[in-house]
A protein has these predicted regions:
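The canonical Cys-X-X-Cys-His
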Residues: 1-4, 54, 96-106, 160
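Alpha-solenoid repeat scaffolds
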Residues: 36, 65, 93, 136-139
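Generic structural signal for alpha-helix termini and adjacent loop/cap motifs
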Residues: 2, 31-32, 61-64, 89-90, ...
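Residue-level hotspots at or immediately adjacent to binding/recognition sites across diverse folds
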Residues: 42, 141-144, 158-159
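Electrostatic cytochrome c docking/interface patches
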Residues: 5-10, 63-92, 110
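Gly/Gly-Pro-rich "capping" loops immediately C-terminal to redox-active cysteine motifs
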Residues: 4-31, 40-46, 100, 104-134, ...
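C-terminal capping alpha-helices of c-type cytochrome domains
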Residues: 44-67, 82, 123, 150-170
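Extracytoplasmic c-type cytochrome modules immediately beyond a signal peptide or single-pass transmembrane anchor
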Residues: 19-76, 84-85
Length: 170
C-alpha cells in the first residue's frame, strides 16, 4: 500500500523502518536469502538506484508507534500473561530472553537492524517466526532470531504475535 502500513495476510507494515534495513531486506529477496513469491519478482525489478529510492521513500513515511512505550521496569511482572509476559520477561529456564531486550519497549524497534514489532500484523510476525524455526528464513544477524524462534511453541508464537499486533500505536 502507498501508506507503507501493509495489509494483514498480504504485506507487512514497513512505514518508517530504517532505509538501510529495508534495502538489506530487498537485497535478500533478490538473492533468494529471503523467500517470498510476491517480493522476489518485485525486488528483481529494482536496480541499485531503485532499491535506494524505494527504501528511502518507505523510511520517510510516518511509523505509527506507541506514544509513551512502557519499559520493562514500568510493568509489574506478576501482572503479565501470555504473549506480553514472553515479550517482557522471556523464559530464562529455556535461555529465551525477552523480545523487548532487542526490539525495544513494546517492540518499537532499535537502530538500523532491529525492526519494530509494535502494531505489526500478527500473521506476518507468526509467519516470520515459523520461517526462522523451519530454517527457511536465515538472514538474521548471527542467527539470533532463528535460535530464539526454535525455542518457541506454536502457542507462544501466536501469543507473542497477537501481543505485538495489539500494542496501541498513535
Amino acid at each position: 500500500q502507498a501508506s507503507g502500513l501493509g495489509m494483514p495476510n498480504l504485506a507487512p507494515s514497513i512505514a518508517g523502518m530504517p532505509a538501510s534495513y529495508l534495502a538489506t531486506q530487498i537485497e535478500h529477496f533478490k538473492k533468494g536469502e529471503r523467500q517470498s513469491a510476491t517480493m522476489k519478482p518485485m525486488a528483481d525489478m529494482l536496480d541499485e538506484a531503485g532499491v535506494k529510492a524505494t527504501s528511502e521513500w518507505f523510511a520517510s513515511l510516518p511509523l505509527p508507534l506507541p506514544e509513551d512505550p512502557a519499559w520493562r521496569g514500568d510493568k509489574d511482572p506478576a501482572s503479565l500473561t501470555g504473549g506480553e509476559k514472553l515479550a517482557y520477561l522471556g523464559d530464562w529456564r529455556r535461555d529465551l530472553p525477552s523480545c523487548v531486550t532487542c526490539h525495544g519497549p513494546e517492540g518499537v524497534g532499535v537502530g538500523e537492524h532491529i525492526p519494530h514489532l509494535a502494531g505489526q500484523h500478527a500473521d506476518y510476525i507468526e509467519d516470520q517466526l515459523k520461517a526462522w524455526q523451519a530454517g527457511t528464513r536465515v538472514n538474521d544477524v548471527n542467527g539470533i532470531m532463528g535460535a530464539m524462534a526454535k525455542k518457541l511453541t506454536a502457542e507462544e508464537i501466536t501469543a507473542v504475535a497477537q501481543y505485538f499486533a495489539n500494542v496501541q500505536t498513535k
